[in-house]
Amino acid sequence: MTRYDDLPYRTCVGMMLINERGLVFVGRRAGVEQVDDSYVWQMPQGGVDPGEDTWLAAKRELYEETSVRSIEKLAEIPDWLTYDIPRVVAGRAWKGRYRGQRQKWYAVRFIGEDNEINIANPGDGHKPEFTAWRWEPMQNLTGLIIPFKRPVYERVVKEFASLAGAQAGT
């Protein structure tokens, strides 16, 4: 069996979806990932297919999780951000193949209407990733995420903080 420290990171993308009021989309995670039910909210994220461009992967994941296509790209964090999952769940998460994720993050402006968001029947017939959603002030995000992902969210919020108050078209 592969030692935890020798496992690779899963290559993924994350998307901060910001509405016209500067609020950020968060979804309540479905499934068993949660260690503590207090921290079940997160932004859309997901895996990058082999050979797939990260920006295209981010748009695909956003659509597959929310049905959203009405976006304008605002920013990208140039670095890959990583987190490790707790050892206690490493054998179950991703069938024990990864120790965590390395993520490329993007911020986008949502230019559609809220009724475009459909987490119950997301794009391309994918299984729902979220059971509920809401708009949150950016500064609240780190308190909503599961603790082992918090350092990534702290960096994402720091990098994209100037976008929180930016209005569409400015």
Curated annotation (Swiss-Prot):
Cofactor(s), by name: a divalent metal cation
Pfam families: NUDIX
Motif stretch (Nudix box): 46-67
Keyword Hydrolase: yes
Domain Nudix hydrolase stretches: 8-158
Gene Ontology biological process terms, A to Z: nucleoside phosphate metabolic process; ribose phosphate metabolic process
Coiled-coil spans in chain: none
UniProt keyword Acetylation, yes or no: no
Function statement: Accelerates the degradation of transcripts by removing pyrophosphate from the 5'-end of triphosphorylated RNA, leading to a more labile monophosphorylated state that can stimulate subsequent ribonuclease cleavage.
Protein name per UniProt: RNA pyrophosphohydrolase
Species in which this protein is naturally found: Nitrobacter winogradskyi (strain ATCC 25391 / DSM 10237 / CIP 104748 / NCIMB 11846 / Nb-255)
Gene of this entry: rppH
